[in-house]
């Protein structure tokens, strides 16, 4: 349910350590289970309804809903940051009873006009498509044809073609009641044509576009002028329709820039009816040296659109002629808002800006390397490492049911995927996204509760559904965060790879936070488990699986020849490693004692042998 994007981590914000613990105790059935040292009371939970609260519905309805009458408000007397350029057209008052202007580029050059609207139903994913559309149609005053009905995260969305239909649909909002007695909210937004209706440029048209762009490129200034590209005479004469507020066309233009003029420093996109900047988000990657950007005389309504391109290191920006300029009370607030996104900006709308307020900062220093594991004491080190070795030997096996012994009856567990610009596309983590409980993105309280796994049976059933893995125990870094007589909190960070399915051999990084209580005399029992998963960085990939962990086995030391047993005992004594890891080292070196010793010494000097290898 969570979206791509910058990194926010989930947290168990609605529970405490002892919640839901059962008074029932099971006798130990292995290394994990045993009698608890402490009892914790069951806390009641007010589960509430299954739908959103009324305040949340009002927020969703108000956010982004637009009037059907027009796309521009009448003059409001607000401060216009800078005067118009000499060639700027006079301001016209638009009547509120007129249809909104065509900004989608969906019409033809001969004056034909098609206005599209996106219809959004918050939390619509919980409704059946047939029931939802028929319920809306029964109350809508005009018949409508939904185009491209789909679910986007927890929302249902589709498109309609004209303002009359959109207005009629708006009247249906809150008139439908679902079986949970919640009102169905309908939000209307003006939109570009649906993606399936946006014309893709043909290969020969793309070649002509390249020729057109080459004529508009000034190599000496490294400047590309795409002002009013749709009405370029060369393109019009060949009936090539390049509409830059359509994603397909903008992507072609950005690809041409990336492949031919990545050194671009100045780009003019004025007079192209741009009303959003989502499609320019990759510009900072494709033209990293861009310093001048002209977005004047477009239809940008909010300064928040600039957030989508704030990765650019701009020195000059043009925004005059956009509706967003009318929303500032004075010049200083306008400059401040823009400079917040582009701190190195020197000129705005052709005007020199006052120098930015800067503070003396120390010269950059190299951060110290991350330290290794922290346990607090040798006793805790032995306890935690033994627990992790047992836990992940089962977790990496073909059957994770053995983890039932590791969890308390009232345990809680959740999974979260961080979001951020540096993260790869979400499809590389598809098996995890459906269960992600990232509270920065997931606002629906019902889904937050649903994605929180309660009781050890549900926790282990959930873990069994996750992809099969092999963890690189040599990558583990463990930090003991808190310790009392009845509770232990520790985090483990490391690397694993998937061993089957579509993402086989994909390497992931993880951080796992365990809260555990004593079990038996020497064991631990998990009451709270938070798992964070992301794709491994290039540096993590380079270091991963340098010394593979031994394959989990029910018999750690299989039958060996007498000579091999003597060699194994001697190697374990000299290296200090346990028998399992000593045998692994000898086998990897074909039982060549001398070579195994050299490899061990080298890996130990490099810090690549995990601490569990020395746990006996």
Curated annotation (Swiss-Prot):
LRR repeats lie at residues 263-288, 289-312, 313-340, 341-368. Residues 40-56 have a biased composition (Polar residues). Residues 1-115 are annotated as: Disordered. The keyword Cytoplasm applies. Gene3D superfamilies: 3.10.450.50, 3.30.70.330, DNA helicase RuvA subunit, C-terminal domain, Ribonuclease Inhibitor. Residues 562-616 form the TAP-C domain. Keywords: Cytoplasm, Leucine-rich repeat, mRNA transport, Nucleus, Repeat, Transport. It is found in: Nucleus, Nucleoplasm; Nucleus speckle; Cytoplasm; Nucleus. Residues 383-533 form the NTF2 domain. Residues 116-195 form the RRM domain. It comes from the Eukaryota. Residues 22-32 have a biased composition (Basic residues). Its main location: nucleus. One of its GO terms (cellular component) is nucleus. GO terms for molecular function: RNA binding. Residues 1-17 have a biased composition (Basic and acidic residues). One of its GO terms (biological process) is poly(A)+ mRNA export from nucleus. SUPFAM superfamilies: L domain-like (SSF52058), NTF2-like (SSF54427), RNA-binding domain, RBD (SSF54928), UBA-like (SSF46934). Changing a single residue, Gln-246 to Arg, the residue found in human NXF1, fully rescues both constitutive transport element (CTE) function and CTE binding. Heterodimer with NXT1. The formation of NXF1/NXT1 heterodimers is required for the NXF1-mediated nuclear mRNA export. Part of the exon junction complex. Involved in the nuclear export of mRNA from the nucleus to the cytoplasm. PANTHER family: NUCLEAR RNA EXPORT FACTOR, NUCLEAR RNA EXPORT FACTOR 1. The leucine-rich repeats and the NTF2-domain are essential for the export of mRNA from the nucleus. Belongs to the NXF family. This is Nuclear RNA export factor 1. It comes from Coturnix japonica (Japanese quail). The gene is NXF1.
């Amino acid at each position: 349910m969570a979206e791509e994007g910058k990194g926010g981590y989930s947290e168990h914000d609605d529970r405490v350590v002892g919640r839901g613990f059962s008074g029932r105790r099971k006798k130990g059935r292995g290394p994990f289970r045993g009698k608890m040292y402490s009892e914790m009371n069951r806390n009641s939970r007010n589960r509430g309804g299954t739908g959103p609260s009324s305040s949340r519905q009002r927020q969703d309805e108000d956010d982004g809903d637009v009037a059907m009458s027009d796309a521009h408000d009448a003059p409001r007397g607000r401060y216009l940051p800078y005067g118009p350029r000499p060639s700027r057209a006079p301001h016209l008052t638009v009547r509120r009873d007129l249809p909104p202007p065509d900004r989608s580029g969906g019409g033809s050059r001969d004056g034909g006009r098609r206005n599209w609207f996106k219809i959004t139903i918050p939390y619509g994913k919980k409704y059946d498509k047939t029931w939802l559309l028929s319920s809306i149609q029964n109350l809508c005053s005009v018949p409508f044809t939904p185009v491209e009905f789909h679910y986007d995260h927890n929302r249902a969305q589709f498109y309609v073609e004209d303002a009359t239909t959109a207005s009629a649909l708006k009247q249906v909002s809150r008139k439908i009641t679902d079986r949970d007695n919640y009102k169905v909210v309908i939000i209307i937004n003006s939109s570009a044509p649906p993606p399936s209706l946006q014309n893709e440029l043909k290969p020969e048209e793309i070649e002509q576009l390249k020729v057109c762009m080459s004529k508009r490129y000034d190599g000496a200034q490294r400047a590309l002028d795409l002002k009013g590209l749709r009405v370029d005479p060369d393109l019009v004469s060949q009936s090539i329709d390049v509409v830059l507020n359509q994603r397909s066309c903008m992507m072609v233009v950005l690809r041409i820039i990336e492949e031919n003029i990545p050194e671009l420093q100045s780009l003019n996109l004025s007079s192209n009816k741009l009303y959003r900047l989502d499609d320019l988000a990759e510009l900072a990657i494709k033209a990293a040296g861009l310093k001048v950007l002209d977005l004047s005389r477009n239809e940008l309504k909010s300064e928040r659109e600039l957030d989508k391109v704030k990765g650019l290191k701009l020195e000059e920006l043009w925004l005059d002629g956009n509706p967003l300029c009318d929303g500032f009370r004075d010049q200083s607030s306008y400059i401040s808002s823009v400079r917040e996104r582009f701190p190195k900006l020197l000129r705005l709308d052709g005007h020199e800006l006052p120098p930015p307020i800067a503070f003396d900062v120390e010269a950059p220093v190299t951060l110290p390397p991350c330290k290794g594991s922290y346990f607090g004491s040798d006793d805790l080190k032995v306890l935690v490492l033994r627990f992790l070795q047992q836990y992940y030997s089962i977790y990496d096996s073909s059957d994770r049911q053995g983890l039932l012994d590791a969890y308390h009856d009232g345990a809680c567990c959740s999974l979260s995927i961080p979001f951020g610009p540096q993260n790869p596309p979400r499809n590389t983590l598809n098996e995890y996204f459906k269960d992600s409980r990232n509270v920065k993105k997931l606002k629906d309280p019902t889904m937050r509760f649903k994605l929180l796994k309660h009781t050890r049976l549900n926790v282990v059933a959930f873990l069994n559904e996750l992809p099969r893995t092999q963890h690189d125990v040599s990558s583990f870094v463990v930090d003991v965060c808190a310790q009392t007589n009845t509770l232990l909190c520790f985090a483990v960070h490391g690397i694993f790879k998937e061993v089957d399915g579509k993402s086989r051999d994909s390497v992931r990084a993880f951080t796992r936070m365990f809260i555990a209580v004593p079990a038996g005399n020497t064991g631990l029992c998990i009451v709270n488990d938070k798992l964070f998963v992301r794709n491994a960085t290039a540096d993590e990939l380079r270091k991963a699986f340098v010394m593979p962990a031994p394959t989990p086995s029910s018999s750690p030391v299989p039958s060996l020849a007498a000579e091999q047993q003597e060699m194994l005992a001697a190697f374990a004594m000299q290296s200090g490693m346990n028998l399992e890891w000593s045998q692994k080292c000898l086998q990897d070196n074909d039982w060549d004692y001398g070579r195994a010793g050299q490899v061990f010494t080298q890996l130990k000097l490099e810090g690549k042998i995990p601490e569990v290898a020395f746990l006996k």
